[in-house]
Amino acid sequence: PNLKDFTFVGEEVVELEVKASTDKITMNCAEITISSASVNIGGENIESKDINYDKEQEIVSIQFPSKLQLGAGLLSMKYTGELNDKMKGFYRSKYTTPNGEERYCAVTQFEAADARRAFPCWDEPAIKATFDITMIVPKDKVTLSNMNVIEETAHQEDSGLKIVKFARTPIMSTYLLAFVIGEFDYVEDRDEDGVLVR
């Protein structure tokens, strides 16, 4: 996320299974602009040329030029969004330092159906998935998520950034997912099963 202009960019890959003949994928999406979407099934990559939003229903329809093959595949998307000031979805939160300086952090509040403001998804509590979260953040900031950090590396193209990869979550609803970026301190210990907790 960019904590100066309050925007974020994302890349998402969804494992899915096409069970019925269709040329359209519909999912929840609010206050996000998808710049590209494609599906790869059976080694065939199909780019979408038509992405339509129903802002009132908070739904995006990704249209493909031909029917998708049946079977397992990957839906890949690139998108941008706003770190809003509405305290829902992926939003900015203002705080004041001890010397009186105003600063911002980026936090999430997805319950009950606001994950759609951070990434396109099927954002209903009954629909569950696992999540592999990777955050690209300023190297002087701390990022936390549901799971432990499994890898942290310097960004190859921007020395001011770092890439933080978290372990895969258990299968869960979108509203249970969380991540934060900011000037945080944290305590670290192991639970009774030896899992590192921050």
Model feature map: region roles:
Residues 1-198:
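Acidic/His-enriched low-complexity segments
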